[in-house]
Amino acid sequence: MVMTAEDKAQVIGEHKKHDGDTGSPEVQVALLTSRIVYLTGHFKSHPKDFHSRTGLLKLVGQRRKLLNYLKKTDVQRYRDLIAKLGLRK
């Protein structure tokens, strides 16, 4: 895995709602976003890595599903999260 335990703990700490929060949509989207950013950089130096590209598309789809769920349940939390992560709507 690309992210070390310290990196993961830092991302969780920035987006958690309470102590021990690892499963909220905000935390999950933030973790997926960090993996997506890493893989995007990976493809700049490895353009023919199609197997990893398939994994990237799965991650993007999973993040999209979580964002859609968050948008349906609480629009304000959705807007705050995409602003914080710098994502498009």
UniProtKB/Swiss-Prot annotation:
Indicate, by first and last residue, each region the UniProt record lists as having compositional bias (Basic and acidic residues): 1-21
Pfam families found in the cross-reference section:
Ribosomal_S15 (PF00312)
- Spell out the residue ranges making up region: Disordered: 1-24
Q: Which GO terms describe its biological process?
A: translation
UniProt keyword list:
Ribonucleoprotein, Ribosomal protein, RNA-binding, rRNA-binding
State a single Gene Ontology molecular function. rRNA binding
Q: Which family does it belong to?
A: Belongs to the universal ribosomal protein uS15 family.
Indicate the quaternary assembly: Part of the 30S ribosomal subunit. Forms a bridge to the 50S subunit in the 70S ribosome, contacting the 23S rRNA.
Q: Which HAMAP family match?
A: Ribosomal_uS15_B (MF_01343_B)
What NCBIfam families does the record point to? S15_bact
- Protein known as: Small ribosomal subunit protein uS15
Tell me which species this is from.
Solidesulfovibrio magneticus (strain ATCC 700980 / DSM 13731 / RS-1) (Desulfovibrio magneticus)
Q: List the top taxonomic levels of the source.
A: Bacteria, Pseudomonadati, Thermodesulfobacteriota, Desulfovibrionia, Desulfovibrionales
Q: Which gene name belongs to this protein?
A: rpsO
